[in-house]
Amino acid sequence: MTTPAKLTTGDIRGHLIGQTLPTTFGVAALMSVALLNAYYIGKLGSEELAAVAFIFPVVIALSSLGVGVMVGINSVIARSLGAGDVAQAARRANFGAVFAVAAGTALGLILYLLIGPLFRLMQASPALLPLIHEYMAPYALGLPLLLLQMALGGVLRGQGEAKVSSLIQLGYALANWALNPILITGALGFGGLGLSGAAYAMIAGNAVSCALSLLFIARTPLPINPALIRECRMGESARAIVSVAGPAALSNAVNPIGLSVLTALLASEGQAAVAGFGAAGRLQSFAVVPLLALSGSIGAIVGQNWGAGETGRARLALREAWMFCLIYGFGVGAVLFVWGDWFGSLFSQDPAVIAQFSSYMAISVWGYAGFGLLIVANGALNAVGRSSIALAQSFARVVLLMLPFAELLRGAWGAEAIYGAELFANLGGGLLAVWIAWRVLAAHKPAALA
């Protein structure tokens, strides 16, 4: 299926399109699962929805860890292939898979034992704890599968197999589309399991993803063969992956944390502001899917060329990706700016909510391009082993730009200060990320792969 380091030759723009387009469909498929979950859980009742509100931050944190593992494996494999060391790439692929299962098992057991204390610490009421346990118990035991499917995704993405990765994501989505109505609310004569059904559907989806991944990986130059683990220098392999995975996981978690703080600040501006902000955020999450896909695709292209010493091609890929961010970001922003009221009316009939929705759209959409610049820069930095810089950029965007702006101006501007804070952080963070990432890629000193 794969020619090693196939992204080190050929047209860069063609590679960007070929990697990003299928990834866009894959990301959209995953997002559809989240919407489907929300729909069926909403049919269970208000208590179940309240339980999910407590569960969501924990799931986001653990998903961020999985993304970090995927990015770390992607990075080391892409650079090894670029350097022409297929044997090392194969060792790292197999070590990464075993590492993911081991980490998932350890974390899953810890989480299972701490479900009660953790959610009591989060101030979950006694009435909600049984519902939370319904979901979190199977989720915790299924954590090894979650991290394994992320790791296998990293093996494929590091080889530039974006189309295959997207097919696997679609397989995950199809499994959930089929199982969610049956396992959550009940269908086809089955009574439904409630919240635990949502967790079991996710586990089944991850099992499908793992099976498909192993099937496709077996046809690449990096098949999963645990016997290769014996040839690895364990400590060095772990450091190579964790040095990227750790900061990447934290970087991925920073933005949701920042948005949670903004939501808390917005609560003082009234329920309509919170509702409008939340509804607009759901629309925004779909609007930026191509930017998210591009940030996930840039890694294999930059990583392989960086490992091969093709600094010029790596920088060209980054420049072309940034141009897309500017064109798409401002283009889709203009559409949402013009049609803000109409989109708002799709989410609510309350004039106050629609007004806040439109106000948020009128301000925040002009920052999409900057957000794209930042996440693409971070994807490139992770690919070349500079994930600590990517983490610093994400941290600076939220902690040094977004939150101070919102807090300082909230008294004078109200809700618009919070909307403006997101715009300021995206534009400022994006420009800073461009300056830093371009300088890093100009100095060709690849991080050691050991």
Where are the regions a protein language model picked out?
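Residue-level signal for short hydrophobic patches within transmembrane helices
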Residues: 13-32, 36, 58-65, 141, ...
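Helix-terminus/linker motif at the lipid-water interface of multi-pass membrane proteins
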Residues: 32-50, 119-126, 182-193, 249, ...
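Alpha-helical transmembrane segments of multipass membrane proteins
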Residues: 35-39, 109, 117, 151-155, ...
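Short runs within selected transmembrane alpha-helices of multi-pass transporters and secretion channels
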Residues: 70, 74, 139-158, 165-173, ...
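Transmembrane helical elements of multi-pass membrane transporters/channels
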Residues: 18-34, 138, 172, 205-209, ...
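Short alpha-helical transmembrane segments in multi-pass integral membrane proteins
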Residues: 1-23, 77-144, 175, 190-246, ...
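Small-residue-rich hydrophobic transmembrane alpha-helices
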Residues: 49-109, 146-165, 276-340, 371-390
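Alpha-helical transmembrane segments of multi-pass membrane transport proteins
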Residues: 14, 29-30, 66-67, 107, ...
